[in-house]
Amino acid sequence: MAEALPEAGRYFCHSCTAEITPRLPEYTCPRCDSGFIEELPETSRNSESNSSNNSGTDQNRPSFENIESAQFTLPSGYGQVTFGIFNEGLDFPMFGTSGPVEETRDGESRREHQSRQRYGARQPRARMSTRRGAGRNEGVPTLEGIIQQLVNGIIAPTAMSNLGVGPWGVLHSNPMDYAWGANGLDTIITQLLNQFENTGPPPADTDKIQALPTIQITEEHVGFGLECPVCKEDYTVGESVRQLPCNHLFHNDCIIPWLEQHDTCPVCRKSLSGQNTATNPPGLTDMTFSSSSTSSSSSTSPTDENNTANNS
């Protein structure tokens, strides 16, 4: 004779946090297919019969019945925050003062509250349920995103120094390693710039600096509107300037400090070694200067003087 099927009875599903009629003979939840169910005592069935009749069938219950919440206690002075995640949507964080969270929320049924109180069940971990309404959850912010906004919005860097990674699973390192606000970003940029401060070309050789020719500015130089590329001051007739191998002219006090730190021309970035010297730089390509037979200091053009210095 075949054995009679066991009676289904009433069970409590810890995954759905709701009273259900299990699927036999597997004893699984018909809503979430979970086997984490517990049989209700006979006394609890009678006490909750009225609430079961009023609430209707499981299929007609609103989605707010299956709310799951998680409570985080923030550092002193910040109170508490509760996250509520529904099966078909997301309840954004609500901030309040320190103290117990309201036990009866709009989205939690009376029976669910009594069941949790009876079994001493802990508040389940906040998670995104995908068994129903998966399409509606597309584009909904994740819990990690909400926590990141919470950290960026209300937790000060001084308060985060003692938290470490702790419950803030989205922070994968020390919170003080992050840039907090505009000032923190400015600090990082300043540090990066300081790292590149001394990474330029090496200083020019002292002998090459002393060997740079000194010429005097003539009226032809002034007529072309030449100026010192460093201080941007116009040259005056009879003024002594230093000429680099690339034919660029500079005030002595402007170019010497630069060459003592960098072996390059401030204008064309050519070295003083002569290997990459620009014989006709763009600024002097179309300039021609006539020789003066009466003045020994301005008897040749800047180009001729540079060639003479190289030949010697």
From Swiss-Prot:
Subcellular localization(s) per the UniProt record: Cytoplasm; Nucleus
Q: Which GO terms describe its molecular function?
A: ubiquitin protein ligase activity; zinc ion binding
Supply the SMART domains for this chain: RING
Q: Where is the composition biased (Basic and acidic residues)?
A: 102-115
Coarsely, its chief localization is: cytoplasm
Entry's EC annotation: 2.3.2.27
Q: What is the protein's name according to its record?
A: E3 ubiquitin-protein ligase RNF126-B
**Source species:** Xenopus laevis
**Protein encoded by which gene:** rnf126-b
